[in-house]
Amino acid sequence: MRRILTALAAALMATITALATATPANALAITAGFMITSGGRWCTVSFPDPQNPTIVYTAGHCYKDGITEVSLGNIKIGQFIPEIHDPATDLIAIRLYSNIPSEYSLMSREPLLDPWVPNEGSTVCKYGATTQETCGTVLSVDDTKFAVQMPADHGDSGAPIYERLKPGSKGVHVVGTVISEDPRRPGVIYCSTIGAINNFLSQTWGTDWDMD
């Protein structure tokens, strides 16, 4: 428990630092990788909706029935939308309050580029609220989920998984989101593919939803 609380304190400091170093115009802009809390749980923002800046997404299991308020530290930023919740991809939408903007990027301000399909053996990274950026190898892939050898901890649920064209390049290609750790294989996490998320959100919004 002490290790988790220490990690949580470090994550809060990272979020505060990101806000402090942002320009005034977007100092509170919610990006992929931000830590959010609700009902005593903390999770990670997966990504803002590229077509609707008032919507962001996170892991569905972060929603506790009856508790819709979502906060960033002591700032109330929005509410879960229980109607936009998909157990299959473990995704849920959050509607931001009118005074809370979003930015289509990582916390590092790297823009989110067109999504990619994860491939077995490729190197991917994630930005989680607790462990920040860690990278690892894709172990297996199917139509809706994939497994990655990668460090993660409580609070990283919902974190975006992405690839870079090359080290130091500006912009990342999202390939999925973190669901959970594998209880039988330490250091392995399960993720939803961006393709499965795309299908769910296209049906939900009644349009050809895409991260492009």
Residue ranges and their predicted role:
Residues 100-110:
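Short, structured beta-strand/loop micro-motifs enriched in basic residues and often containing a Trp
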Residues 28-99, 140-212:
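Catalytic histidine site
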Residues 15, 44, 58, 130, ...:
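Ser/Thr-centric signal marking residues that sit
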Residues 109-153:
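Flexible, gly/ser-rich surface segments that form the specificity/activation loops bordering the active-site cleft
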Residues 1-27:
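Secretory targeting and sorting signals
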Residues 99-101, 131-132:
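Short, catalytically relevant binding-site loops at active-site mouths
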Residues 5, 67, 116:
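Solvent-exposed, flexible loop/coil residues
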